Amino acid sequence: MTKQALDATIADMAGPFLASLGLELWGIELSYGGRTVVRLFVDGPEGVTIDQCAEVSRHVGLALEVEDVISSAYVLEVSSPGLERPFFRAEQMSPYVGRQIELTLIDPTPEWPGRRKFRGELLAVEGDTVVLRPEGAPAPEAEEAVLRTSWQGVRKANLIHVFPEPGHKPRR
């Protein structure tokens, strides 16, 4: 089964149960190595509790076993996406425009030769295109200071949590 097919199967199995708890599936990570690890990231309007993660783990784990979705031994991990949440779809980034993110591309772009990893301010999400002002870029108003990339060209994207200066209120 391909990663996309496995992701879709797990999402279909977990979705209704998560909805009944007022949660949503933020994303799925699969890692293969010495052992297979299936990571489910779940979130809700008020976040997610440890008890909810445990309940989701029991329910989804049982469903995966009954349906024999993964034929080899695996470990199921369920957690919140956290402060430095990974992004699994471009539209997940929209609420974080203006915040700092880290972006790793599959291949370098012609505008930024030899460079695949970027940190900087998320300027916009336009459909499937992510617009970022990388750290160390030329003058902010210059067009070459902006990285525009299709989500299909992104290997990994994470929010960077910036802790507030002592005595200042955190950004929301």
From Swiss-Prot:
<comment type="function">
    <text>Required for maturation of 30S ribosomal subunits.</text>
</comment>
<comment type="similarity">
    <text>Belongs to the RimP family.</text>
</comment>
<dbReference type="InterPro" id="IPR028989">
    <property type="entry name" value="RimP_N"/>
</dbReference>
<dbReference type="GO" id="GO:0005829">
    <property type="term" value="C:cytosol"/>
</dbReference>
<keyword id="KW-0963">Cytoplasm</keyword>
<dbReference type="InterPro" id="IPR028998">
    <property type="entry name" value="RimP_C"/>
</dbReference>
<dbReference type="InterPro" id="IPR035956">
    <property type="entry name" value="RimP_N_sf"/>
</dbReference>
<dbReference type="Pfam" id="PF02576">
    <property type="entry name" value="RimP_N"/>
</dbReference>
<protein>
    <recommendedName>
        <fullName>Ribosome maturation factor RimP</fullName>
    </recommendedName>
</protein>
<dbReference type="GO" id="GO:0000028">
    <property type="term" value="P:ribosomal small subunit assembly"/>
</dbReference>
<dbReference type="GO" id="GO:0006412">
    <property type="term" value="P:translation"/>
</dbReference>
<dbReference type="InterPro" id="IPR036847">
    <property type="entry name" value="RimP_C_sf"/>
</dbReference>
<keyword id="KW-0690">Ribosome biogenesis</keyword>
<dbReference type="InterPro" id="IPR003728">
    <property type="entry name" value="Ribosome_maturation_RimP"/>
</dbReference>
